[in-house]
């Protein structure tokens, strides 16, 4: 909401909010994944939600459209979050944001998304419209990319551009070893992948605020790219 209303940078707004909420590292990681996931897939989420919502998303009172996107993202992209939990948490968000009257709408729309997630509406016809929705990029940019690269290369570019970039960190061998650090980070809900060719380098995603991780606080790793 801060990004949409005030033009705030996602990283800064999320870090500030996580600092206020005092979440566990695991919950902060989940929160971060949801925030970035919703922003990266906004047009795709809008497309699916519009199929089950009787009102246009941009006509809903804020922050209802974002609550719907948050719920739909969890249902469609997060296997570890049960559908019923995503629905109930979204309904609760309506209440905590002073939109209790809309809780029935949110409940109904998200239940339909969950019921149909194996048979979702087809993407729009036409290469430009399809790619725009599938990868949540504006049509003007998709047109430009297709004219420069062709359909196949443009789609590959859009796919990569829409993936979250991992954070590269280096294990501090004076305080831990790679296996122990991997186990510790995964225990806190962080997605960890050892770098394919650089020893002691790990690629992290879904970290939330890095500074809340015990391993960061205790100096068991440093943020540094693989080339460093």
Residue locations for each model-derived region?
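Class I Rossmann-like S-adenosyl-L-methionine
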Residues: 1-216
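Conserved SAM-binding loop and adjacent beta-strand
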Residues: 217-228
């Amino acid at each position: 909401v801060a990004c949409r209303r005030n033009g705030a940078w996602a990283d800064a707004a999320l870090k500030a909010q996580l600092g206020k909420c005092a979440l566990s590292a695991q919950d902060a990681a989940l929160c971060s994944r949801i925030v970035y996931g919703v922003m990266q897939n906004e047009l795709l989420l809008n497309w699916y939600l519009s199929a089950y919502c009787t009102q246009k998303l941009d006509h809903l009172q804020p922050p209802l459209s974002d609550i719907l996107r948050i719920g739909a993202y969890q249902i469609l992209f997060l296997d570890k979050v049960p559908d019923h939990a995503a629905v109930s948490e979204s309904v609760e968000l309506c209440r905590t944001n002073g939109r209790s009257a809309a809780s029935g709408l949110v409940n109904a729309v998200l239940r339909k998304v969950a019921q149909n997630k194996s048979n979702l509406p087809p993407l729009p016809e036409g290469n430009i419209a399809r790619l725009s929705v599938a990868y949540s990029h504006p049509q003007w940019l998709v047109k430009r990319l297709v004219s420069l690269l062709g359909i196949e290369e443009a789609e590959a570019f859009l796919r990569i551009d829409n993936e979250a970039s991992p954070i590269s960190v280096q294990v501090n061998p004076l305080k831990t070893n790679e296996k122990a650090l991997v186990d510790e980070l995964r225990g806190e809900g962080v997605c960890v992948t050892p770098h394919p060719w650089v020893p002691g380098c790990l690629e992290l995603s879904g970290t939330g605020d890095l500074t809340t991780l015990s391993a960061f606080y205790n100096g068991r790793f440093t943020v540094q790219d693989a080339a460093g």
